């Protein structure tokens, strides 16, 4: 059955609502944790951040138990159980990937002492080793002069692509399959532009793991994010083929929601890169 038919039924409507609730709660908590880290300006793990991470784990586990009990009461078939498994496995996958990026950034900032660099009367925490790397042979000035516009373009590409993904589900609910394919195609196109710009950036700046420490950090984290963008594009291409078949049932709807959720996760990671790698460099150069 199509999603709009399922929602019109009370029982299945409650089931689908409960299926989406953990995704939304986890997404909102991820935004809260990200906002805290971006506001603090460093990856020093505080008690508040640890508590938020524990709350995420507790909520996912609690919702899994509640959903399992409700599924047994309603007597859902094997398809419903499969949807539930897909949903929670994907949640744990995204959460583990989020923690992987947190470890990368935390390793960068925890091994160095923080100093206060005055920038327009605002204290900007930058590591001692990091500031020395930035001033190394004027290399980073070259990077800033020729690559900053490309960074802004990449940010715009991912931001608009995320906005496009938000409209996919509503177009499917209205049976606007052609519109949903156009929206997903636009997101894929913007993602490919992002990949092209990243490859161009690495080529023109000759960034490798052996140039200097700054390039090692930039190359490692950017390459990891690059692979996540590539995986997201593959997922969206698969979704287009699923929409083309016009067999949009429970499982495929949940998969599309998971893909949208994953793409927003990629957006959040890019804003982390923009804040802690690129903008910190700009502040020191100023």
Curated annotation (Swiss-Prot):
The chain crosses the membrane at residues 13-33, 40-60, 85-105, 133-153, 173-195, 199-221, 223-243, 253-273. InterPro entries: Cyt_c/ubiquinol_Oxase_su3 (IPR024791), Cyt_c_oxidase-like_su3 (IPR000298), Cyt_c_oxidase_su3-like_sf (IPR035973), Cyt_c_oxidase_su3_a-hlx (IPR013833). The gene is COIII. It is a multi-pass membrane protein. GO terms for molecular function: cytochrome-c oxidase activity. Keywords: Membrane, Mitochondrion, Mitochondrion inner membrane, Translocase, Transmembrane, Transmembrane helix. Gene3D superfamilies: Cytochrome c oxidase, subunit III, four-helix bundle. This is Cytochrome c oxidase subunit 3. GO terms for biological process: aerobic electron transport chain. Component of the cytochrome c oxidase, the last enzyme in the mitochondrial electron transport chain which drives oxidative phosphorylation. The respiratory chain contains 3 multisubunit complexes succinate dehydrogenase (complex II, CII), ubiquinol-cytochrome c oxidoreductase (cytochrome b-c1 complex, complex III, CIII) and cytochrome c oxidase (complex IV, CIV), that cooperate to transfer electrons derived from NADH and succinate to molecular oxygen, creating an electrochemical gradient over the inner membrane that drives transmembrane transport and the ATP synthase. GO terms for cellular component: mitochondrial inner membrane. Belongs to the cytochrome c oxidase subunit 3 family. It catalyses: 4 Fe(II)-[cytochrome c] + O2 + 8 H(+)(in) = 4 Fe(III)-[cytochrome c] + 2 H2O + 4 H(+)(out). It comes from Trypanoplasma borreli. Its EC number is 7.1.1.9. Component of the cytochrome c oxidase (complex IV, CIV), a multisubunit enzyme composed of a catalytic core of 3 subunits and several supernumerary subunits. The complex exists as a monomer or a dimer and forms supercomplexes (SCs) in the inner mitochondrial membrane with ubiquinol-cytochrome c oxidoreductase (cytochrome b-c1 complex, complex III, CIII). It is found in: Mitochondrion inner membrane.
């Amino acid at each position: 059955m199509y999603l709009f038919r399922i929602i019109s039924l009370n029982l299945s409507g409650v089931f689908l609502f409960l299926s989406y609730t953990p995704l939304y709660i986890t997404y909102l908590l991820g935004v809260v944790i990200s906002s805290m880290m971006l506001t603090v300006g460093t990856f020093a793990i505080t008690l508040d951040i640890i508590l938020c991470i524990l709350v995420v784990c507790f909520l996912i586990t609690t919702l899994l138990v509640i959903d399992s009990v409700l599924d047994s009461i309603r007597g859902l078939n094997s398809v419903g159980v499969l949807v539930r498994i897909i949903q929670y496995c994907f949640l744990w996958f995204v959460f583990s990937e989020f923690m992987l990026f947190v470890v990368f950034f935390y390793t960068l900032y925890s091994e160095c002492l923080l100093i206060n660099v005055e920038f327009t009367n605002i204290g900007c925490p930058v590591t001692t080793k990091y500031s020395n790397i930035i001033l190394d042979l004027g290399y980073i000035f070259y990077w800033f002069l020729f690559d900053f516009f490309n960074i802004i373009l990449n940010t715009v590409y991912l931001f608009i692509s995320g906005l496009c993904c938000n409209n996919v589900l509503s177009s499917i609910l209205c049976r606007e399959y052609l519109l949903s394919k156009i929206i997903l195609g636009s997101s894929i196109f913007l993602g490919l532009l992002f990949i092209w710009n990243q490859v161009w950036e690495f080529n023109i700046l000759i960034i490798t793991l052996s140039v200097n420490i700054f390039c090692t950090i930039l190359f490692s984290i950017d390459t990891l994010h690059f692979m996540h963008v590539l995986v997201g594009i593959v997922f969206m291409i698969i979704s287009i083929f699923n929409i083309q078949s016009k067999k949009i049932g429970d499982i495929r709807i949940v998969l599309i929601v998971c893909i949208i959720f994953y793409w927003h996760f990629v957006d959040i990671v890019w804003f982390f890169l923009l804040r802690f790698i690129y903008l910190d460099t700009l502040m020191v150069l100023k």
